Amino acid sequence: MEALTLLYMTCGDRGEAKAIARTLVNERLVACANILGKMTSIYQWQGALEEQEEVAVLLKTRRDLTDAVTERIKSLHSYDLPCVISLPIQGGYPDFLSWLQGEVG
């Protein structure tokens, strides 16, 4: 079985998150996207403390597609510097992981 990864991405609103997620799934770059509820992000940006409502998105894919997914997100995202973080999937329900592998690429 090929290595799998969970990508974490944030978006400014649910509409943008859905649009990006649909594109990534339709293009078979990710098998599944989970859009989570609103959250508050607090961070430094260009010398100022920022606080913004965002939504988080979890994306499941093969590890070898991480760079392609990241580049596609950058081309679709409204942020100058979108948050895209990769976390390795170390295990899970084998049937689900097999399905995931079959849906991408």
Q: Where are the regions a protein language model picked out?
A:
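Positively charged, small/polar-rich N-terminal and surface patches that mediate targeting and assembly
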Residues: 1-105
